């Protein structure tokens, strides 16, 4: 019954007025009022909203196949879920991402939105739950405790694939620059001190390899997250569900999502354990560590332009100072550094929340989901931004690379096989003290011939193993 643009819905706490145009109901309204915490609603996590709809559609399919849900109910529920999976009605998911209750508010938000849209499709008004009910039908044979973690895992799979794509593009950008810089000899450094020669191409190919390795680690974590507890219901015993429900719901969810999901071998363990989230978050932290290290290098190698390393140029994307004319800052690597710092904190949040579970349930999966999806989203954006607005436009300064190479006393290392470590040390010390080149000092001491020095300092001999 509606009046003045509102309908009345009731729960165990009493009656409340719900806006007529709202697809959510009384449970969602109370949760919206209770959890004004982060300013981020479930709608800000589109993968989670789509995953919730996929789980509800799979449940309806399974229950219908088992004869527990009439076909017209199943069809209306499934149609509503398809609309949500296609991006509609996301604005109706209004509960804060961070909430008490182990995700019950999120589950009920989904139940009510799906139910009210299904009612419309059946020719009824929103809130006419005598024809289709959020709990009795949309949530049939389900608990928040299997729906919510399953939805998080499915959403994580979606987010993971997009991050993998962004990482692959960044890896390819570094590999392309490595090819372009393959012939540019430069000085390597350890502990910020002159070390031995390498090519700029080798330096950039290292970044591509780092990303390749982390892509593999993320793919491995993705297999772990594909194990779900749908059918566990409240604590893993499967109470209120048909004996074949878990199997049929899994098959439906695999079909709907296209994911290679599996049911956990022990549903009681799977319902209370958050180890898979810890594992995935740890891999995200590893990726963030690598990205931040790479960006530290890019900032250092491009420092200057006249009083720093100045070996590479980052593409200028904006003016760098409100007071210093002409200054350009490495803003893209800097923003990636900051994303990494955020991911480190998110990983700690996941760790604490996973540890805080008690007995048969972890009540803190909402903050785990919040932290995980923020890390996924920001890392994906960071990889894309770094590839498109920085790495693809990096250029080298060959003259600067040559200058630092020729002036470095570290070239004395290449003399070890010819004159031994002791004499090579003496050559390096004299070159450093006098400003002479390594070539000049070793020839003056007559410890090597011109031909031997040429061979020792030949670029190809400086950057890879060889037999003398």
What do the predicted segments below correspond to?
Residues 1-468:
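Conserved, well-structured ligand/cofactor-binding cores
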